[in-house]
Design a protein with these regions (language model features):
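C-terminal "cap" of GNAT-fold acetyltransferases
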Residues: 88-92, 126-140, 144-146, 152-173
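Acetyl-CoA-dependent GNAT
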Residues: 8-14, 18-31, 39-102, 113-115, ...
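Conserved phosphate-binding and hydrolysis motifs of nucleotide-dependent enzymes
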Residues: 69, 73, 107-109, 147
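Extreme N-terminal starter segment of soluble prokaryotic enzymes
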Residues: 2-5
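Active-site acidic-Proline motif in GNAT/NAT acetyltransferases
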Residues: 100-102, 106, 134-135
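Conserved acetyl-CoA-binding loop-helix of GNAT-fold acetyltransferases
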Residues: 105-118, 141-145
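Short coil/turn segments at alpha/beta junctions that flank glycine-rich nucleotide-binding fingerprints
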Residues: 106, 123-126
């Protein structure tokens, strides 16, 4: 059986984080976006300088999930002023949970998501929330199993294309 480990991403792993972030986003959303839209998104969200700032943020954490020592995906969580939006008082945001396609179906996404929920629980905050693409029914059903409910929605830009994300929340009390 392969060993699974979840650990924080280090500053010296920025290139690996960038590679995995781009690859997982492309694998997940390329079917609904042009190459230009994806590249514009990557040029904004996944530059080395943007990722370096995220890793340095004291109100945000980024983790790799490793299988047999190889990065298989990543997680990013935020709280306080580092949340992508201030939509709930006293809240913890799960911003990104991505698993490389080659590692999907092995339960790694579930492990990473449950790790995020544990981080939310020990934060002492009242709510955990996340955004999910309105067309990603599979993820919506998963989040519903964990007790998340839709409370709002927002626009998510991939290049010049506007998608709608549902905002889901769960009480931590």
């Amino acid at each position: 059986m392969s060993q699974v480990e979840i650990r924080k991403v280090n500053q010296d792993e920025l290139s690996l984080l960038q590679k995995i972030a781009i690859q997982t986003f492309r694998e997940t959303f390329a079917f609904d976006n042009t190459a230009e839209q994806l590249q514009n998104f990557f040029d904004e969200a996944y530059t080395l300088s943007a990722l370096k700032l995220e890793l340095a943020d004291k109100e945000s954490e980024t983790y790799f999930i490793l299988m047999s020592g190889k990065a298989a995906g990543f997680l990013k969580v935020n709280w306080d002023s580092s949340q992508t939006e201030q939509v709930l008082e006293d809240a913890f945001e799960i911003q990104r949970v991505y698993i490389l396609k080659a590692y999907q179906g092995l339960g790694l996404g579930k492990q990473l998501f449950e790790f995020a929920l544990e981080r939310a629980q020990i934060s002492g905050l009242s709510w955990v929330w996340l955004g999910v693409w309105e067309k990603n029914v599979k993820a919506q059903l998963l989040y519903a199993k964990y007790g998340f409910e839709q409370f709002s929605k927002h626009s998510f830009f991939v290049g010049n294309k506007v998608d709608t994300d549902w905002l889901l929340k769960k009480s931590l009390s």
